[in-house]
A protein has these predicted regions:
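Post-transcriptional modification and biogenesis factors for structured RNAs
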Residues: 1-166
């Protein structure tokens, strides 16, 4: 299996990006940040949330969405949005695909979504909930993509510190 990619479009909250970075390190996933960012990458909040994993993160920054597209020609991109007509479990995530998430206050711009309806996905929710937390949403969709690939390259068995399972 190739490496999956998480793409954050103009993230605003450093703690969310730090948590997402930690999830990316734990899963062998690349993180792509599309500017402008609502924070500096050296802020304490991002380091605290990412803990000591941030230095191991494979992260790339882009000036804007057009810069991202130019540097990743032909990329297969899934757009995670509350506005999508299908759920995140309805699609098959290809090797090396990108899963894009929008900024916390507004999501992915609709002019991007309308051009990519067939690859827009949503996490089902009840009622009139606006959205889930960004880092939680990334984890939900990313782990579905990893599950579809049988968690290739990941540790599937845990170990007790002071006991044996047998």
């Amino acid at each position: 299996m190739g490496v999956l990619n998480i793409e954050l479009h103009e993230p605003e909250i450093p703690a969310n990006t730090g948590n997402i970075g930690r999830t990316c390190v734990a899963t062998g996933t690349r993180l792509h940040l599309i500017e402008p960012l609502g924070f500096r990458l050296n802020e304490k909040a991002i380091k605290r949330a990412g803990m000591d994993y941030w230095e191991h993160l494979d992260v790339t920054r882009y000036l804007d969405y057009e810069d991202f597209l130019k540097k990743n020609p032909g990329a297969k991109i899934y757009y995670a949005t509350t506005k999508a007509p299908q759920t995140y479990t309805d699609v098959k995530y290809e090797d090396d695909c990108f899963i894009m998430f929008g900024k916390e206050s507004a999501g992915i711009p609709e002019d991007i979504l309308v051009k990519n309806q067939e690859t827009c996905v949503r996490i089902p929710m009840i009622g009139d909930i606006r959205s889930l937390n960004l880092s939680n949403s990334v984890a939900i969709v990313l782990y579905e993509a990893l599950r579809q690939h049988n968690f290739a390259h990941m540790n599937l068995e845990g170990h007790l510190r002071n006991y044996d399972w047998k």
